[in-house]
């Protein structure tokens, strides 16, 4: 947490107000009049309900005064039961200033666009990533694994959705929720590719895991940070209703540094769910991006077929492991496959490995990232300044 304290002044700019700070990530694509409001720790449910009623009344009073038909207002409510409570919506400057002046508000963050972390497509390339997970040397062509293969584990794919009818999922993929639009389908393809790497029968690391689509990004592969956090909350609550110790989640997406996003990610980990996150594709220090900069998640950088850092991959002390992320073949909506590159492709290898190890009884939750790091091979060349050189491995040596 000391390290995170050093990051914050570098990563966030704050508007000086008479009350809670209004934070904004430098270079972020902010959503006009969009805000995420986070309550102070210890706020009771009753006080939170009263606060939201007050916000609704203030907002509607402003609309009536202006004679406006632009509804806006509160859109998402967050209560992770793990030290993160708040809400998000669209408010005018006067309203957000009143909210900031409340004693029960910890901070306010400008809502921003979050994007999928895949960057390029190349057809007809060799599929090497899956084989690399079970090989001690590069160039392997086979993937060796225990037949449990993540059976009994649920993987939440927080992304663009999943083509749950794709034959590679064998009926193990189901729709969970949609916080971004009204199209309950993967109209982008990114999420289906990620799900295939996590748990596809042909392309996946954990071939018997159950896959749940949590759609937070639209057909263009983008969405608001507030919608992403709403999807994170849904996944945590759904897993907690079952057995969070047998749940993993993947977030192959990101944006500028967001204290709210990191706080939500940390709440998921505290709930006992293993969370794998893409480091990002800007060839920069991952500390400037979220949720990759949250220290308690398992942040994955991308490697290429020769066991080096992929040119686009983010790096830094907050990267936990490397995983295959360049020219990765996996499922595409409507059937068949395609190749994508990005830390988006690295993270689901880590998520799938987490599900695989839970199925073997090798751990769960946040501690699972430490297990994965211990099992990883110190083989990555030129990993980046201050960055681990460890590449994931499932322990089945070839």
Swiss-Prot record:
The protein's name in its UniProt record: Subtilisin-like protease CPC735_050320
Entry's Gene Ontology cellular component terms: extracellular region
Subcellular location: Secreted
Domain Peptidase S8: 127-398
Any one of the GO BP annotations: proteolysis
Role description: Secreted subtilisin-like serine protease with keratinolytic activity that contributes to pathogenicity.
Gene3D superfamilies assigned: Peptidase S8 propeptide/proteinase inhibitor I9 (3.30.70.80), Peptidase S8/S53 domain (3.40.50.200)
Positions of the propeptide segment: 20-117
Catalytic residue list: 159, 190, 344
UniProt family annotation: Belongs to the peptidase S8 family.
